[in-house]
Amino acid sequence: KRYIDRFNLEGSSKKEEKNIEDLFKIEELQIDDTNKIQELIENIKKEKKLIYFLEKENSSELKNIIKKKITSITIYIQKNKTSYYIKINDINEFTSKFKDVFENKDIELYGYKLNEDYVMLKELGINVGNLTFDAEIAAYVLNPSTKYNLEEIIEQYLEINVDDFIENNKEDENSSQINLFDNLDSSKENNKKDLYKKRYSIYVYGIQKLQEIMSKKLEEINSLDLFTNIEMPLVKVLGEMQFNGMYVDKEELIKFGDSLKEGLKELTNEIYDLCGEEFNINSTQQLGVILFEKLGLPVYKKTKKGYSTDVEILEKLKDKHPVIERILEYRSLMKLNSTYVEGLLPYINENTKRIHSYFHQTVTQTGRISSTEPNLQNIPTRIEFGKRLRKVFKPEKGYVFIDADYSQIELRVLAHISQDEHMLEAFKNDEDIHVQAASKVLGIPKEEVTKEQRSSAKAVNFGIVYGISDFGLAEQIGVSKKKANEYIKQYLEKYSGIKKFMDDIVELAKNQGYVETSFHRRRYIPELSSNNYMVRQFGARAAMNTPIQGTAADIMKIAMIDVYNKLKEENLDAKIILQVHDELMIECIENDKEKVKSILKNCMENAITLLIPLKVETSEAKTWYECK
């Protein structure tokens, strides 16, 4: 039943709708009022729950990992239905009073964006104990394609509009936030504080109610175990990874930038020579005129502004003129310099000399972890300059990187889910899966499969995981669309278990509206009921891909939690610092490296039992570049 009905607010006047007292009381406490704070802490200990919200303020001059400072904490006590708002003027006083409560493993923590809280509190010397409920993560598990703003979550699940419960509308409040540091008189200040107090009080009341409702909803869709035993324990792991960061040799990064600029200079001169004149290579209009009018290259696409010179077009023109290769390389180096040299430098923390990326678990629809500020997961590795960039990422002196990589995890998951006999056989016998595919499709003995044939089979194997089209395969392996179509057809005839899985999963998604991973991570696919053919095709690819990529992502998360716990248990001087798709990286002291390799291999290979074994390869290195 709607909360608005339950509190008899339907049909009442706006003034009554905004009446907070119908739901809970609000008290403001002073951080230096030791008796009152102690009384609050005793209540938290009795309830064994800390339902809280931290107000944070951006502060770019801070040298912290997260450039924000905590300005207030609001806490909700269920027993007396009271929200306590505490302004924090002295962060040390906050730390001394609340450290024990946050660290107490018997007290469950309920909040929102706990990953960020974890890092900020750890910087204050608080090692957060029992992270139990994060409203953002619960909303993500319930539906990975929606937004996770706390007010939107409260409105969606509790049908409470936060703005209906405060005096000002959103526009007025935002304008008052903008003027936060202006010379406001005390009444304006008090009014603003009152608004914040009410807003954050509704947040903590909402978090408590959300925990009750969302837990039931998670149970209904069989995802409570995923939330409780995978997603919530992962918060701490990702928080630790951000806190740990990755050391960057700043001087070497600057030198690398200089070498890129030199490379760009050389390429610029080569491009000018090959084109017979100087022009602005970064101007698509000028480049279009040079390529298609002066050099007379075939035109594939025109836009309102002129000729299209995007990567796809340039790739098609590669064999038409030697300048195209240089232009593609020029663009790659430009991107490397702007995104990964000039882009990385501001992220090096002055205190730690490390880059502390955010790792997100509520972004991708398949359950994969992503990273931002900066994104270390998409540093290009196909071009040599991109690979060389990884040389600037190093362990501290006396430490070493241990890198562990799942071997073909998505194909192993596909073999397990589809139960295709040929694929299962290849993995059980530790055969080269791509050689086997080429042999079956082309009808030739395995020992006769050429490098090129294996490469084509590899493109199909991995393409199947992503729902590749004949056009996509043709582009990738350089054959006609017809030939690519025949290849896919023959592949699916030989691997009939995979064909059946693909047909069945799309049909299932059409009927029930969603697909799931092996761990009941659900993804809704409304695209399958679209009137647009292209949208439906996207839906079909998502239906095929999500159970595979999503299950692989879940396995990686389980492995990360197990590795983290084992490193702690063994009391090793080692920490997880990076996760990129199927790869996990640890920085550890030289003496512990063999133990760490063993832990990584053991935890990752035994994260789940499939019909075929999971295989992990480990390596050690003195730079990220040297990792296999």
Question: What are the residue ranges of the model-derived segments?
Answer:
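Nucleic-acid-processing active sites and adjacent nucleic-acid-binding tracks
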Residues: Y76-G111
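Short, conserved charged micro-motifs
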Residues: E93, S283, N591-S598
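Metal-dependent phosphoesterase core characteristic of DEDDh/y 3'-5' exonuclease domains
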Residues: E116-N169, V237
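Active-site palm subdomain of RNA-directed nucleic acid polymerases
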Residues: L218-I230, L234, I555, A559-V580, ...
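Conserved catalytic core of nucleic-acid polymerases
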Residues: S186-S187, F243, N349, H356-S357, ...
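Conserved "right-hand" nucleotidyltransferase catalytic core of DNA-directed polymerases
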Residues: K1-K87, I153, E173, Q177-E384, ...
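A common structural junction motif
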Residues: Y495, N602-L610
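Catalytic palm active-site di-aspartate
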Residues: D134, L234-F243, Y406, D470, ...
